[in-house]
Each structure stands twice: as structure tokens, then as C-alpha cells.
């Protein structure tokens, strides 16, 4: 599904100066969300496509802003508030808006998913972790550059690798199974197996260059 009016509103909430949390990231996650929805439909898994779409669209909105000075405890809470204002302002159903807000909060590192929509949004957001290593590495480099820009601090490649690996592991505490293809023939989560393989390769990677 597409909502061109809301997409035009959402894109204004993503700063192109950000190397990772920009609207290109949203386009990628929307694509991953569509794949998840398609697999759910094939297996008869109930997922509200509108909730997933709108939650992904706004899940990193306002990322460059200082959420603390705006009265929010996390970037996810701030993004969720921006989503609620945009969706309510355009006449969307209150219950749908509530579910979108919840699904955005499910992308927080410490969150536990309560619904299939929560799982779909979190899984789509994290899909790049289990992608080909070239995609994984580009994302981690973009995140490093973004971190340095936002914090005003330089960090060595080795320091970043350790920080990033520890952070990624925090996102692996929960299975996000919605469809049968989530597990491999050995009953292991493909997402966890592929992500941990990327982490191991990343920790051994001496080069900060994408093609290195």
C-alpha cells in the first residue's frame, strides 16, 4: 500500500544530512516490510498492513532532533509522537494510530513485541543486519559516520566495531518469527545465524573502507 500524502509529510521529518537514519533507510525498510506482509498472506498469518506501513514510515522520524530537550525519554517515543500527530491530523482511525504508535515503540532496543504488527515492523527495521556482508558493512560505516556527526566525537575503527557488535547483540534477544521460513533446516533462526556471521566477519575486518 502507499499513502502519497503521508509520505510527503514523513519525508520532511528525515534529515538528508544523516548518513543512515535518512529516508533511504525508510524506503529499504518499507521494501522489507512488504516482503514480510507477502509471506504472512501466503501462510494466513494475520497482520494489519496499514499499521506496518505507517509505523515503518515514521519509525525514525525526527532522528536528528534532541528528543530529551523535547521531553521524550527515547528517540522511538519522539518518533511515535510525530507519527501520532501526523496520522491524527490526516483523519486516520484512532485505533489504527494507537497500534502504529505501539509498533514504533517496538523498534526500541529494549522493547518486546506484543503483536504481529510489532514483530513485522521490528523485523523489517533489523533486516539489514542479516543481509549480505557488503550491505551490513556499509550500514555500520554509515552509522559510525552518523554517530561521529551527532556526538561531535571521533572514534577509532576498533572501538566502533566493539560498540556496534555489542549493540547489535542487544537486538538479538527476541525471536521475531511470523512465518515458517524464519527457521532453517536445523530449526535455527536464519536472521540470528546470518547476523551473527556478519558480526564475526565485522570484528575481524581491518578496513574501514566499504570495498576493503
Where are these regions (language model features)?
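An active-site-proximal "capping" alpha-helix that borders the catalytic cofactor pocket
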Residues: 29-30, 74-90
Amino acid at each position: 500500500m502507499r499513502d502519497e500524502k503521508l509520505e510527503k509529510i514523513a519525508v520532511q521529518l528525515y534529515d538528508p544530512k544523516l548518513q543512515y537514519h535518512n529516508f533511504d533507510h525508510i524506503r529499504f525498510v518499507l521494501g522489507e516490510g512488504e516482503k514480510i506482509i507477502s509471506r504472512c498472506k501466503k501462510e494466513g498469518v494475520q497482520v494489519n498492513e496499514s499499521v506496518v506501513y505507517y509505523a515503518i514510515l515514521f519509525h525514525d522520524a525526527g532522528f536528528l532532533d534532541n528528543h530529551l530537550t523535547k521531553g521524550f525519554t527515547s528517540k522511538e517515543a519522539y518518533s511515535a509522537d510525530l507519527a501520532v500527530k501526523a496520522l491524527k491530523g490526516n483523519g486516520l482511525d484512532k485505533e489504527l494510530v494507537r497500534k502504529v504508535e505501539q509498533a514504533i515503540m517496538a523498534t526500541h532496543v529494549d522493547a518486546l513485541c506484543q503483536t504481529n504488527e510489532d514483530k513485522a515492523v521490528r523485523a523489517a527495521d533489523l533486516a539489514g543486519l542479516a543481509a549480505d556482508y557488503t550491505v551490513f558493512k556499509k550500514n555500520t560505516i554509515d552509522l559510525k559516520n552518523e554517530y561521529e556527526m551527532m556526538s561531535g566525537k571521533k572514534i577509532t575503527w576498533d572501538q566502533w566495531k566493539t560498540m556496534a557488535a555489542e549493540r547489535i547483540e542487544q537486538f538479538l534477544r527476541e525471536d521475531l518469527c511470523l512465518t515458517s521460513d524464519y527457521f532453517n533446516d536445523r530449526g535455527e533462526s536464519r536472521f540470528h545465524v546470518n547476523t551473527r556471521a556478519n558480526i564475526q566477519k565485522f570484528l575481524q575486518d581491518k578496513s574501514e573502507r566499504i570495498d576493503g
